[in-house]
């Protein structure tokens, strides 16, 4: 398990969590640990059924307090074939060799038609004491704020399934959203 002191705390009534800013401050890692009486599946449903602007407001308005964060190292790969999804959205001709019109992209020397044969979406995330690797991005930082008054230190120990988010702080947009279900201590 990795330990760090953070300064942004979340408590939405169903989960507690923290935000860990990366170098430069544009991106951050957010961990949300469902309360002991809330399953990960139920918490994910709660997030999915909450208006997006309310979720963004929660993620952009943490309590400014000390958080003792403890989390496992983890890594996941994900691959999704998008052909059927794109066809369902109306892009069926682009996948049909006889109907596709991709001539503005180029021409085959033998005169055959260009078409889309496969669209894959792959993600990779790895979090350890050296930082986070998500796609081709690697960076990590700990921000510290000086406090003149003693404050209560919140504690979040990610020792059961939790939700994580790689968040773009400038655009208030989640870049990656996932869950860790196998906790390796």
Please annotate each region the language model reported.
Residues 1-185:
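Secretory/exported precursors with cleavable N-terminal leaders
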């Amino acid at each position: 398990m990795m330990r760090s002191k953070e300064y942004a705390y979340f408590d939405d009534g169903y989960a507690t969590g923290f935000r860990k800013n990366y170098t430069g401050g544009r991106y951050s890692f957010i961990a949300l640990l469902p309360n002991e009486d809330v399953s990960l599946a139920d918490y994910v449903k709660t997030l999915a059924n909450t208006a997006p602007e309310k979720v963004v407001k929660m993620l952009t308005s943490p309590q400014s307090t000390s958080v003792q964060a403890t989390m496992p190292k983890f890594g996941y790969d994900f691959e999704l074939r998008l052909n059927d999804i794109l066809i369902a959205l109306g892009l069926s001709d682009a996948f049909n060799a006889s109907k596709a019109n991709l001539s503005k992209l180029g021409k085959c020397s033998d005169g055959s038609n260009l078409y889309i044969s496969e669209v894959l979406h792959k993600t990779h995330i790895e979090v350890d004491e050296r930082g986070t690797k998500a796609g081709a991005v690697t960076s990590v930082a700990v921000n510290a704020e000086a406090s003149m008054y003693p404050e209560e230190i919140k504690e979040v120990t990610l020792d059961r399934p939790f939700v994580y988010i790689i968040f773009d702080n400038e655009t208030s947009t989640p870049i990656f959203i996932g869950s860790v279900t196998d906790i390796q201590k």
